[in-house]
């Protein structure tokens, strides 16, 4: 990191020739040094440019102001990185940094030349960029003209001139392209350059098609991006995500190609089948030759009315049949102008792309099924599930991750900045002394006027009696400072910093029952937050957390005076007082983005805050965590420590990184140097700098003030009304009234009523009703106006307008009043829609709504930029479309429209072009593209549409979604569920409840006194009732209110099982889901016996909010046998009972609940003797039967059979008499069996257990239905209406299967958990939509009626019929005229919602939009595009109602599953235990043991073949052949010549021969081992089938199936390409994600099938006979079970549900005929029932399309992120696989050991990252590998040591080690037991020692031999003597180091002997690990 020079006056130095010379000198010096430095390792990166001083950024404010005369002047570069580079900077007035190259521009202009200086001045001036911006915008407006006038030519020249001028200025200022920071070095300038070049080219050179070149001008719109800074980053993110998409795109293209090939083989030519009229004496050929044009088609082929294409038909039995008098032929062109077909590979590919993006795919689906047969539905199921759901969501996942990474990078950068500033400030501290004088003066200045307020602050601190002394003193000091600010009204400045209406501001402002003075004091208290308690870690004043949770709940109840809340309560339940008032200080420091960490409730941990009276309280901290805080007696351990807490994870909100920087910057002291004080100019700058960085908050406020000080004086005088004492009293009185919770409740009720009144508007309304609505509106307006006025009086305007909600209220009231006065003005009725905004006032008291609005608010920031980018893209494409295709639409319109008028969707003018582009963004591109291709040629249209589709829809819209999902940080929704702060509404409701209960109780007591004869029982009952009433009060809204503690309670005998007695009184029963037991997000402090807590000795402050500690807490939760140890995390709805005494599993439980037994003692039966004993034995027998596995299996079989029986009851049942009779008897049998099962279970389990299980209730209800219908049938009432409708409820029978199949139950439990949030979102959607719905009434009610000709449903033109009366006149004259309404319209609130749902799902929205656009007025005949701009209403609705709200579903569901995952300890919630095993196996692919390689055959011939086959080149050749084969299959097309068919046939034969050859070769060389490899078996099967298909094609075709199936099987070979994927890491990750998602997706699919099954049965019984029109016809209907399933599968993606609903909305003639007779059936009429139909379809769409399919998305996103994480790890599974592959060669017998001598070769044979290249002996020795006898080393030890080398030493290594051992043990149960006897290091040491000893001995012998030779030799011998000694020393060293070395490494390196890894070791290891982790955490904490 480059250290920045201390910013001071000397930082700004003019750039002169000397500066340039200095730089050149530095460069020269650098060059001379370079040669030496070259040797340095490349890894040491040089200094980097400072991120704060990058070009384009603002000058950091630490530099103070720019001295006069230095603005827009060349200055020396501030960034040290550029010290030796030729650059200089220029700063403009806005302090933006511009960096320039100091070399001469264009080799002419030096930095000092006047021309360049002037250019630079122009370039950096803010007006220059403004001018360019305005030019671009004006230019864009001109571009939208479709046929511009002559004079616009000159305007064009002007634009070109301005752009040229801009470029010249840039080139003069920067230089052209040589060197850094020149013109062409910035890619954005390339754009300018191209635009200008083209402008001149088109002018001077005649290039033919000008309009195409003119489209290049559109690129100018992109320049806006380069001018607006925020956009560049978004575009950066977009480009990043497109790069990341490459893998997905490859995978998508591959999958689509495969599917397209299958489609090509299956459906080639099928879509040309048409119904031809039978004509006497004419053959098909003669007819075809006589047909010339389209027109003739109509004569011969069968057309359905209103359709452009002839009716399709097929030759198979289950395909579409032709009507009477027609027969099926293959003739003519394909449907949709011939563009929909599978005839060639390219059209098939387009069709599959369309399927994948799900655009109008129901049409393709219906056409294909009609032509080919219903069995092919399977093809579509596979494509939709794999292609559409999987691939499209992968794109979403990738884009979301790219966004997330971008986010992460920004946060990193922020941290980096913080570091830089810290370093800077450290430097500045050196100058401290000089600055002290100034600081002192400032302090004097601020202290004036403090003392005045002494008394006041004194009293205010009295209010917090519980606080510790020191905190109180500190608070007083702060208060004195702050009071001064209050009086001068300056807190406004402070609020600017707290992100508005977020953090604590919204808390403090909403206190109730404080006088106005008290109210103000409370704000004081808030200002004083930072220093007031020891807990406040960083000043919460600056903690403007981005999505701070506080604002969601903490609206009310901050004051001390809370008498009102406790009016009915005795003192035992009073609220934990000071905790309320000090809420502000309880911020927990958070690290950016650590969203999922659990938050410890600090409130419960701070001793000074406890009341000392031994009562239990609940503290609620600022994050909404409730903690039960007991008096000291219970809360302290004997040694005075606080207890650890049981925390059940609670997510926290994001902290934005930037706020922390700001805090750092502000809080540090700032210093000035002496000499500044002399120079007045500098002194002034010094002052400005001091004001920025002093740590006195006041000055900070002043420097931050948004408004001039006179404004504050004015506000103080006029906006705070404290005139006379009487007025103040009056004000206080009003305040008490207005702020009372009951008033709030009343206002909320008014809002709800007002909303209802607005929703009740409908189309024909009576006068009375109209008047009621008008009067109602006046009344409500009055009420809201009064509320506003009273609040203004009570709070003073100054306070009133500080609260966001009040500003909102006042706006709405003002608008309502304005609207009242302007009510009669025509055209202003839209103002009425502003009243709707009142609905949003509900958010005040409805947390979910508030939160969702907040989420939308949060994402609007980044979305603002994204929306701009989207707008620019839409604009560009709209203009491009208009320029390229506009003319063609005009000229060739007759091709697409019979009457030669422009269709509704065209590109002839900008607005329509924009609509088409917008429609493509909505995902509907194919229909407009057909039109385009028909008029303007295929190529251009395809290119433009695909670009819009991919860029706009797939990338930008997914980025939209990603942003939305990221603003759903994981705390949001769950937080609401446990909204722990009662807001005013809840307080009011609680009060009402208390009142009612009080009345009930007194009444009951009176009655009991009068009648009671058994006082004992009555007392018990009363106790129970008390318990209930208290439960209701204190634990309302999932809040654990105060739990009082009563010491005498210990003496009571009956205790609730499993729970300690001290809470008996106030705890709910375990089965109650409201309790904290089922609400794991509450923090509960629990006493634990000292011996049981493994966290006991940790200091409580260390329970950090790090997520690692979740595990230890969970363990604590399980191990401590404390009061809460039976906490059961079961999902609500399973109703499991927590029993204390271990129940013997084969004994039934009690029959009745304790309550029953208490009231009716007769229920208690003694089981010791007599009848009781017999009864007990019977129960035991039943219990054994019911618990037997066979019984369960039998019942499952019965359920399946009875469900299956329902599928037979279709419209043909009347004709099949035998089946009908069988079904009737079967039905009775099933009913009896189920009744028997129920009775058995009653006897076995007892009523208590049976009726507390939700699944049993389900069984019970379904059995009841069967029973009722059975009884009715026997009594002969089976034809009664109600009985018939009950029969349809039998469709619910399959639901019983849910509880029996674990896979589905898992998913359903997850769903049930998500239901509350889904409901919340649904409600919010409804509220959101309500606004559009009410606007819709104002705009369209009653305007959708039209006069039509019933023969062909065409509308009369307005010239003939202009209004209703004229239409009725016509009707009298003719039968065929009708004044009819659109079925789906805006006439009443239900239909409005239905219309909006159709628009939001983009199904059926066209008709609604056309009707809206054509509408004229009530009772007027519509006219074509009369109201064109109504499209905008729909565009806005789609953006807010569809993009936002429907995507909130995805957000909520994903969010919820993350929540549930946490509750279940991070396991995937969609999988059963079995599937989890599969999943984990998938994850541990690396747990392979070394395999024996296939031995090379001994036979020489076989050996050669073996070498060939196992060679990699062979594999690659085969892959190439497969690819070629695929290409030849792609070449096939419909209607190819015979020659081509022959060629392809022979090519295919060649391929079959080649693949057979491969097969044979492998069989010869691999022998029986061939079949041990999965791929080989696959190949073998494919080859055999290919041969069979080739030789027996004719035979099979005549007798069995069509040979196309064999052609499809050949495609299976393509699957082998997947083997190549080993190489492509990215794609493998994606496939791995798919493999991991499979089990969960299978379960979700099962659930979806179940839902479809039930709905299909239901549909059959209700809609089998509806009229066939719109989407219902002879193939797609509800007549049989199969047809129903086909229809429902189509609606699962919401496709075409409008068409199926339309016929069901026919309720009376003339739409349908209620008397129509259906032959063979007793039913008559073909009318639907609209209410049932709407409920049926809407519920199905919500369940399948919005919930289940989104679960699918959630799973994919989840697994994708897991797979990506795994693939980014330094060592992946592949590396381990590679290790074992190499191992096989060195250990052919798979002994798992290799000899030490081979180790060096082995290490060198590996691939990176495990590779250790030779020479590697030393490294290997240093690894200290354990060896066994025979000098062998075990593979795991080697693998582990190598891994360690890659990953480095760390704590994680230990966990990895244990994982590997565990893996290995699981993979090799037959593990060779071995004891390591030595290690490589020891072996080396032994070698050395042996050598030394040998040497010494040799020398000794030598010495003996030469003893008696001359004295010289003796001297030599002495020298020799030394050598051994040296050796000895070495030896000693080695020896002494050896034990230590082995000791030191023993713990981490030498593995425990594998066969002795027993449980105790493991546990000890675990313990060590946790201790290490804890230590690590302590370290982290201290660092903080």
Curated annotation (Swiss-Prot):
It catalyses: Na(+)(in) = Na(+)(out). II repeats lie at residues 723-986. Residues 1118-1128, 1933-1956 have a biased composition (Polar residues). The record marks 819, 824 as: Is directly targeted by the spider protoxin-II. Residues 345-361, 913-925, 1392-1402, 1684-1696 dip into the membrane without crossing it. GO terms for molecular function: voltage-gated sodium channel activity. This is Sodium channel protein type 9 subunit alpha. The gene is SCN9A.
């Amino acid at each position: 990191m480059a250290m920045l020079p201390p910013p001071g006056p000397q930082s700004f130095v003019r750039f002169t020739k000397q500066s340039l010379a200095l730089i050149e000198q530095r460069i020269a010096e650098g060059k001379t040094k370079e040669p030496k430095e070259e040797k340095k390792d490349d890894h040491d990166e040089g200094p980097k440019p400072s991120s704060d001083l990058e070009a384009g950024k603002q000058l950091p404010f630490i530099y103070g102001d720019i001295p006069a005369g230095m603005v827009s002047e060349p200055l020396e570069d501030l960034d040290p990185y550029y010290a030796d580079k030729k650059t200089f900077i220029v700063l403009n007035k806005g302090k933006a940094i511009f960096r320039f190259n100091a070399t001469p521009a264009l080799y002419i202009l030096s930095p000092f030349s006047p021309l360049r200086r002037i250019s630079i001045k122009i370039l950096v001036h803010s007006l220059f960029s403004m001018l360019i911006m305005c030019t671009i915008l004006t230019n864009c407006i001109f571009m939208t003209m479709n046929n511009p006038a002559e004079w616009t030519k000159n305007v064009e020249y002007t634009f070109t001139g301005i752009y040229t001028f801009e470029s010249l200025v840039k080139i003069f200022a920067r230089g052209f392209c040589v060197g850094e920071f020149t013109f062409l070095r910035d890619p954005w300038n390339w754009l300018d350059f191209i635009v200008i070049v083209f402008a001149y080219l088109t002018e001077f050179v005649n290039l033919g098609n000008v309009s195409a070149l003119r489209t290049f001008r559109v690129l100018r719109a992109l320049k806006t991006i380069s001018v607006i800074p925020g956009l560049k980053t978004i575009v950066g993110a977009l480009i990043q995500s497109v790069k990341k998409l490459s893998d997905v795109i490859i995978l998508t293209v591959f999958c689509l190609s495969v599917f397209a090939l299958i489609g090509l083989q299956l459906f080639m030519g099928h879509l040309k089948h048409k119904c031809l009229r039978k004509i006497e004496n004419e053959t098909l050929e003669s007819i075809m030759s006589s047909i010339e044009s389209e027109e003739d088609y109509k004569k011969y082929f069968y057309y359905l009315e209103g359709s452009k294409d002839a009716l399709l038909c097929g030759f198979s039995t289950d395909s579409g049949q032709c009507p009477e008098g027609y027969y099926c032929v293959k003739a003519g062109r394909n449907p949709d102008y011939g563009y929909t077909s599978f005839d060639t590979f390219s059209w098939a590919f387009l069709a599959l792309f369309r399927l994948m993006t799900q655009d109008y795919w129901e049409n393709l689906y219906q056409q294909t099924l009609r032509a080919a047969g219903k069995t092919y539905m399977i093809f579509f199921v596979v494509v939709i599930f794999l292609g559409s759901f999987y691939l499209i969501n992968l794109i979403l996942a990738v884009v979301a991750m790219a966004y997330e990474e971008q986010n992460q990078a920004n946060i990193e950068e922020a941290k980096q900045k913080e570091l830089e500033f810290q370093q800077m400030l450290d430097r500045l501290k050196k100058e401290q002394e000089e600055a002290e004088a100034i600081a002192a003066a400032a302090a004097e200045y601020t202290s004036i006027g403090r003392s005045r307020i002494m008394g006041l602050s004194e009293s205010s601190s009295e209010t917090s009696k519980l606080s510790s002394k020191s905190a109180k003193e500190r608070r007083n000091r702060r208060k004195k400072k702050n009071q001064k600010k209050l009086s001068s009204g300056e807190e406004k400045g402070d609020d600017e910093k707290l992100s508005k209406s977020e953090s604590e501001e919204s808390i403090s402002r909403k206190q109730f029952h404080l006088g106005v003075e008290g109210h103000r004091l409370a704000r004081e208290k808030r200002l004083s937050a930072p220093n007031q308690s020891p807990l406040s870690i960083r000043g919460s004043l600056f903690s403007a957390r981005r999505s701070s949770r506080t604002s969601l709940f903490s609206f009310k109840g901050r004051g001390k005076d809370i008498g009102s809340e406790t009016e009915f309560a005795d003192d035992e339940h009073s609220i934990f007082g000071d905790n309320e008032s000090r809420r502000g200080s309880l911020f927990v420091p958070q690290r950016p983005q650590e969203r999922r960490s659990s938050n410890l409730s600090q409130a419960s941990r701070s001793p000074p805050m406890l009341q000392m009276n031994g009562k239990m309280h609940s503290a609620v901290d600022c994050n909404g965590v409730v903690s039960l805080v007991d008096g000291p007696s219970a809360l302290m351990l004997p040694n005075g420590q606080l207890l650890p807490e049981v925390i059940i994870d609670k997510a926290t909100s994001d902290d934005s990184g930037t706020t922390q920087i700001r805090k750092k910057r502000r809080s540090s002291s700032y210093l000035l140097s002496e000499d500044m004080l002399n120079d007045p100019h500098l002194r002034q700058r010094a002052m400005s700098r001091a004001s920025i960085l002093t740590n006195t908050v006041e000055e900070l406020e002043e420097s931050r003030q948004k408004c001039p000080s006179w404004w504050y004086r004015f506000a103080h005088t006029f906006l705070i009304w404290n005139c006379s004492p009487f007025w103040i009293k009056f004000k206080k009185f009003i305040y008490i009234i207005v702020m009372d919770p009951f008033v709030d409740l009343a206002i909320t009720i008014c809002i709800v009523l007002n909303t209802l009144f607005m929703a009740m508007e409908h189309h024909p309304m009576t006068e009375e009703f109209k008047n009621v609505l008008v009067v109602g509106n006046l009344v409500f307006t009055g009420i809201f106006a009064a509320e506003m006025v009273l609040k203004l009086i009570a709070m003073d305007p100054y306070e009133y307008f500080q609260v966001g909600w009040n500003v909102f209220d006042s706006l709405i009231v003002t608008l309502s009043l304005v609207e009242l006065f302007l009510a009669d003005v025509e055209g202003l009725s839209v103002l009425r829609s502003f009243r709707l905004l009142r609905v949003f006032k509900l958010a005040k008291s409805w947390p979910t709504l508030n939160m969702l609005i907040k989420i939308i608010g949060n994402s609007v920031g980044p979305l603002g930029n994204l929306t701009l980018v989207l707008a620019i893209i839409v604009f560009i494409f709209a203009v491009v479309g208009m320029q390229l295709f506009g003319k063609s639409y005009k000229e060739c319109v007759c091709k697409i429209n019979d009457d030669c008028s422009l269709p509704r969707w065209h590109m002839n003018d900008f607005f329509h072009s924009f609509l088409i582009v917008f429609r493509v963004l909505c995902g509907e591109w194919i229909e407009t593209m057909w039109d385009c291709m028909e008029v303007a040629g295929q190529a251009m249209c395809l290119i433009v549409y695909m670009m819009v589709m991919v860029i706009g829809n797939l990338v930008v819209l997914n980025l939209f979604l990603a942003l939305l999902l990221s603003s759903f940080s994981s705390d949001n929704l769950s937080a609401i569920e446990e909204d722990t702060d009662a807001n005013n509404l809840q307080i009011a409701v609680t009060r009402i409840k208390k009142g009612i209960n009080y009345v009930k109780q007194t009444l009951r007591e009176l009655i009991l006194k009068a009648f009671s004869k058994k006082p004992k029982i009555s007392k018990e009952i009363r106790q129970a009732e008390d318990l209930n009433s208290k439960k209701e009060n204190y634990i309302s809204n999932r809040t654990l209110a105060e739990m009082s503690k009563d010491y005498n309670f210990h003496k009571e005998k009956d205790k609730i099982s499993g729970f300690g007695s001290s809470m008996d009184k106030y705890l709910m029963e375990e089965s109650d889901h409201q309790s904290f037991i089922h609400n794991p997000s509450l923090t509960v402090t629990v006493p634990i016996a000292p011996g049981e807590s493994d966290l006991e000795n940790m200091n409580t402050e260390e329970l950090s909010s790090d997520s690692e500690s979740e595990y230890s807490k969970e363990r604590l939760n399980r191990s401590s046998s404390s009061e809460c140890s039976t906490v059961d995390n079961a999902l609500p709805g399973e109703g499991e009972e927590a029993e204390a005494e271990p129940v013997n599993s084969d004994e039934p439980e009690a029959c009745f609940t304790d309550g029953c037994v208490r009231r009716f003692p007769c229920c208690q039966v003694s089981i010791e003797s007599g009848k009781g004993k017999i009864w007990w034995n019977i129960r035991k027998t039943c219990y054994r039967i019911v618990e037997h596995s066979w019984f369960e299996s039998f019942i499952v079989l019965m359920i399946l059979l009875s469900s299956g029986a329902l599928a037979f009851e279709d419209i043909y049942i009347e004709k099949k008499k035998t089946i009908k009779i069988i079904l009737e008897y079967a039905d009775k049998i099933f009913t009896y069996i189920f009744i028997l099962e129920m009775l058995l279970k009653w006897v076995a389990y007892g009523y208590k257990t049976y009726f507390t299980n939700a699944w049993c209730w389900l069984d019970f209800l379904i059995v009841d239905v069967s029973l009722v219908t059975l009884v009715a049938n026997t009594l002969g009432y089976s034809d009664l209406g109600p009985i018939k409708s009950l029969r349809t409820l039998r469709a619910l029978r399959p639901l019983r299967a849910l509880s029996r199949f674990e896979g589905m139950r898992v998913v359903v439990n997850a769903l049930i958990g998500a239901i509350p949030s889904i409901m919340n979102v649904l409600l919010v959607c409804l509220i959101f939509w309500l606004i559009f719905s009410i606007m819709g009434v104002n705009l369209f009610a009653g305007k959708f009626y039209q006069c039509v000709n019933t023969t062909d449903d065409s509308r009369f033109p307005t010239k003939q019929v202009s209004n209703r009366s004229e239409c009725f006149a016509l009707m009298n004259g003719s039968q065929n005229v009708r004044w009819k309404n659109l079925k789906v319209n805006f006439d009443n609130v239900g239909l409005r919602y239905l219309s909006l749902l159709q628009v939001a799902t983009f199904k059926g929205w066209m008709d609604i939009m056309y009707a809206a656009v054509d509408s004229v007025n009530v009772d007027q005949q519509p006219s074509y595009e009369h109201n064109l701009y109504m499209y905008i209403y729909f565009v806005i609705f789609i953006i807010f109602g569809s993009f936002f709200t429907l995507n909130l579903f995805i957000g909520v569901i994903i969010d919820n599953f993350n929540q549930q995952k946490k509750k279940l300890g991070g396991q995937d919630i969609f999988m059963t235990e079995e599937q989890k095993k599969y999943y984990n196996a998938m994850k541990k692919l690396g747990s392979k043991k070394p395999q024996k390689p296939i031995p090379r055959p001994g036979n020489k011939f076989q050996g050669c073949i073996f070498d060939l086959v196992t060679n990699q080149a062979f594999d690659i050749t085969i892959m190439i052949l497969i690819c070629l084969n695929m290409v030849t299959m792609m070449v096939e097309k419909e209607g190819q010549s015979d020659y081509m068919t022959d060629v392809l046939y022979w090519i295919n034969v060649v391929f079959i021969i080649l693949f057979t050859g491969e097969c044979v070769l492998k069989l010869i060389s691999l022998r029986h081992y061939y079949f041990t490899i999965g791929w080989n078996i696959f190949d073998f099967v494919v080859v055999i089938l290919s041969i069979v298909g080739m030789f027996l094609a004719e035979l099979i075709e005549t007798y069995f199936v069509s040979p196309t199936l064999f052609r499809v099987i050949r495609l299976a070979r393509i699957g082998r390409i997947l083997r190549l994927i080993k190489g492509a890491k990215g794609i493998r990750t994606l496939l791995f994600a798919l493999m991991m998602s499979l089990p969960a997706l299978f379960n979700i699919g099962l659930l979806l099938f179940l839902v479809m099954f039930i709905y299909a049965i239901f549909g059959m019984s209700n809609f089998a006979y509806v009229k066939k029109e719109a989407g219902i016809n002879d193939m797609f209907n509800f007549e049989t079970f199969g047809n129903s399933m086909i229809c429902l599968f189509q609606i699962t993606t919401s496709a075409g549900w409008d068409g199926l609903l339309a016929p069901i909305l026919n309720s009376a003639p003339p739409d349908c005929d209620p008397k129509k007779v259906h032959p063979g059936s007793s039913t008559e009429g073909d009318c639907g029932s609209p209410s049932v139909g709407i409920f049926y379809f809407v519920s199905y769409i919500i369940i399948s399309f919005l919930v289940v399919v989104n679960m699918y998305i959630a799973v994919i996103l989840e697994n994708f992120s897991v797979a990506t994480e795994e693939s980014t790890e330094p060592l992946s599974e592949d590396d381990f696989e590679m290790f074992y592959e190499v191992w096989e060669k060195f250990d052919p017998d798979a002994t798992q050991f290799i000899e030490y001598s081979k180790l060096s070769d082995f290490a060198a044979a590996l691939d990176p990252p495990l590779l250790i290249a030779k020479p590697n002996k030393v490294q290997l020795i240093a690894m200290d590998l354990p060896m066994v006898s025979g000098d062998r080393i075990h593979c795991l030890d080697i693998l582990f040591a190598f891994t360690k080398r890659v990953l480095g030493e760390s704590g994680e290594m230990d966990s990895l080690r244990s994982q590997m051992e565990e893996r290995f043990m699981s993979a090799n149960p037959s593990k060779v037991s071995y004891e390591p006897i030595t290690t490589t290091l020891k072996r080396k040491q032994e070698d050395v020692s042996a050598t030394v000893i040998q040497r010494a001995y040799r020398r000794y012998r030598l010495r003996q031999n030469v003893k008696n030779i001359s004295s010289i030799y003796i001297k030599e011998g002495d020298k020799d003597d030394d050598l051994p000694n040296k050796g000895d020393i070495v030896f000693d060293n080695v020896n002494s180091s050896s034990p230590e070395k082995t000791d030191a490494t023993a713990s981490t390196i030498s593995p425990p002997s594998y066969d002795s890894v027993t449980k105790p070791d493991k546990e000890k290891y675990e313990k060590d690990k946790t201790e290490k982790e804890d230590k690590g955490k302590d370290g982290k904490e201290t660092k903080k």
